[in-house]
Every structure is written in C-alpha cells, then in structure tokens.
A protein has these predicted regions:
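Extreme N-terminal basic, low-complexity initiation segments
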Residues: 1-10
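Terminal targeting signals and extreme-terminal segments of soluble enzymes
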Residues: 12-13, 17-21, 27-171
Length: 171
C-alpha cells in the first residue's frame, strides 16, 4: 500500500467536490461561495451607523444582501426613506462589484433606482444583485429589492474598479 500524499487527488476532492467553491472554466480563480450571510459594515461609517448590512455570494455573478427596517430608517410618513433605500442598494451592489472584481475597491459611477412599493417598520429588505458585464475597469449590474417576497425597488448601475489597495466593502 502506497502511503504517499497525492496532491492532485486531494486538490480535486477539495476544490471540485466542495459545494462552496466554484472554479471558473478558463481562469484558475477560486471564488468562495458563502452559504450564510456575513456582516459587511464593520468599519465605522454610514452603513454601520444605520444598522449594517448582511451579504452573501450566491454565484460568480449573483449576490444577496439584507437588512431589517428600524425606526431610524423611516420618513415622516412612517415608511422607509428613499435615501436609505438608495444607500442600501449602493452598499449592497457596491459590495457585489467589489467581490466580482476580485476584491478591488469600486466606486459608484451611476445608479438608477425605481421605487415600486413602500417598506414598513420591522420588514426585512432583501436585495439580489446580478453582474451583467465586467470589463477591466467597470462593473455593470442590476439589483432587485424585495420585502415580504414582493418587489419594492429595482436598480441598475455602473461601478468603476479602482487600482488602489486597502479599501474594503460596505462603507
């Protein structure tokens, strides 16, 4: 019996049979797919101040984020303020652009948002972001926000991939 460690076989078992890791067919880039949400608003800033944002990767081109609505997010009419919805989309979709760009910092170039329905106190707001196209310097994406399994807003945007280091997601 041969007791030698078989590196190739071990890599195959770990990378190809592990459901949390995907390998792109032409590029040997590993992308970790999270089954659970993670808090992305860890640094002091706007999103952390406003309750944070949970995020997870679904696939190489699809990401999900969520938050629960509190009194701080409401406007005078008792529904979620449009500015807060915009900030949530910007942070969630921006994190998707960051992840799709192999961790490079990204900044919003344009963001178009359409408000469809009101969101109320205590509801969970869930966003699904899909990368439509990625170039060396830009990420084009769309986003759909849902609450109680109903679409409440849609968005599309463009993010610039910066050539900086040290920046993180979730502002």
């Amino acid at each position: 019996m041969d007791n030698k460690f078989n590196f190739t076989k071990s890599c195959y078992i770990f990378f190809y049979l592990n459901p949390y890791i995907r390998i792109s067919s032409n590029i040997y880039t590993l992308i970790l797919m999270n089954k659970e949400f993670e808090q992305i608003s860890l640094k002091p800033g706007f999103m952390k101040h406003n309750g944070g944002l949970l995020f997870k990767s679904i696939s190489e081109n699809e990401y999900q984020f969520k938050t629960t609505i509190t009194e701080n997010h409401l406007n005078a009419a008792g529904i979620v303020h449009g500015g807060y919805i915009s900030a949530v989309v910007d942070a969630g979709a921006g994190t998707a652009a960051h992840r799709a760009s192999n961790g490079s910092p990204c900044v919003t170039i344009s963001l178009e948002l359409k408000f469809i329905s009101a969101i109320k106190l205590g509801q969970e707001l869930v966003g699904i972001t899909k990368i439509q196209k990625k170039t060396k310097s830009m990420v084009f994406l769309t986003c759909e926000l849902k609450s109680s399994n109903k679409i409440v807003a849609t968005a599309s945007g463009v993010w610039k991939i910066l050539k900086l280091s040290g920046a993180g997601p979730g502002g």
